[in-house]
Structures are given as structure tokens and as C-alpha cells.
Amino acid sequence: HLLSRRQRQMCIRDRVNTLIMIVFSLLCIGAFGFWYHAGYNGIYLIHPRKVFHPLSIVGIILLVPGTQCLSTYLVSFTASLFPQWMKAYEKLMESTGINSGLTVSMFFYSILLAPIGEELLFRGVTMHQAKRVFPFWAANIMQALLFGLFHMNMIQGIYAFFLGMVLGYICEKGGSIYQSILFHMMFNFWGTIISGILPTGNSTLFFVLYFATGVICTFSGLILFRFGTNRLAQKQAAPLYLENTGYDTFYPSN
């Protein structure tokens, strides 16, 4: 009877925590979406061909497993140096109920709401505000650092900083926040769903191949992404493509 009561308490706790995260994301989307739209003359209803190039989409797809693999190594390396950080991280995951199992509401939050809200907050408002004062590289570091601090623990904060740098690069070089939102959604989908069904191993060969896969996918993804965004920028530079180029009004930087 005591165990069942504890299980009910944990179930209620998990639902409350999930509800809080969903409400927070909706508030972020509403507030920072309006700020980003009003401050940067964004266009919500756009044609995908004016934002995405097929090669840039392929590049983003390759970047997902690449950055996931490298993030895994980064977390493992950090945990080996600071095991107390990993214990604190595991305790946090247990207290919030994230490790209790994937529910429909948690899936909805992780794959859809969190990426949109976080991109509007960090790559949308924060990075673009910082670019008014600093060059892109400094603005990108600043928003990535804030993105890491936002996760409120060292383990997640370190790989969130790494991920934030990639997301900032995608948003800036792609010329649209839609690109970083797509990558963020796919990254979370991989970490939430796909990573749980992939084979694992403890052999040296497995770790070498896993790391090599991460490096190859990351660099090939970046190359294809830049090639696709450059092709798209060339089309947008033509007179017929100058109007309503997409959600953002800034052009991809070289």
C-alpha cells in the first residue's frame, strides 16, 4: 500500500512538472515570438522553398547524428572528470520525472514546444540583440553560454553550450530561424526516440566507429548545409526573389 501511494505521488509529480514545462514553453513562444516578429519584421507564413534548399536539409539531417555522437562523447568525458556532476544530473532527472518514461505530453513538449520556444528566445531574440553590439562570433558565444546556463546543471549545460553554438551557426548562416528550429526538433527527436533503439557496445572498435561516425556526419553535414544555403542566397539575390524571402529579413552571412 505504501509503494502504491508513492507511485501515485510520483505520477502526480511527473504530470505537474510536465505541465509546468509546457506552460513555460507556450509563454516563451508567445512572448519571444511576438518580440522577434515585431523587432525583426518576421514573416510567419512563408514558402518552404524560400527558406530551405534540398542540400541544406540533407546537411541538417546529417548534422543530427553527428552532433548527437559528439555530444555523447562530450558528456562521457565530462562525467569521467567530474563524476559528482553526473550524480547531480541523474538526481535532477529523477526528481523531475524525466526518466520515468516518455508520455504523449512529454513527447509533445520535447519535440515541438521546447525547440520552438528555445530557438525564439536564444537564437531569435538573444543572438540578434547581441549582434547589434557584437560581431556574430561573440554574439553566438554569448547566446550559447546563456543556453547552457538555462539548463541549470553542469552536464546538460556543457553539451547545451556546444549545441547552442551549432544552432547559432545554422540560424546565422542559413538566414532563417526556421533552419535552427528544424535541427533542434530533429536533435531532440533523435535523443528522445532513436537513441533508445540503436545498438550499443563497450568494445574499443565500437567507440572508435561511433566517434568516427560523429565526426564524418558533422563535417559532411556542415559542408552540405553551407553549399545549400549559398545556393539559396544566390537565388534570393536575384530581383525576382527580393520580396518576402522568409521568416527572417537578414541574409545568410558568408
PLM regions: where:
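Membrane-interface helix/loop boundary segments of multi-pass membrane proteins
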Residues: G117-M142, Y169-S176
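Single conserved hydrophobic/aromatic residue that forms the stacking wall/gate
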Residues: H1-I12
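Hydrophobic alpha-helical transmembrane segments
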Residues: L19, I57-L62, V104-F108, W137-M142, ...
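Juxtamembrane helix-loop-helix connectors linking adjacent transmembrane helices
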Residues: I43-A114, R132
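Small-polar-interrupted transmembrane alpha-helices in polytopic inner-membrane proteins
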Residues: F136-H151, M185
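Functionally important transmembrane alpha-helices
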Residues: R5-R6, A144, Q156-G214
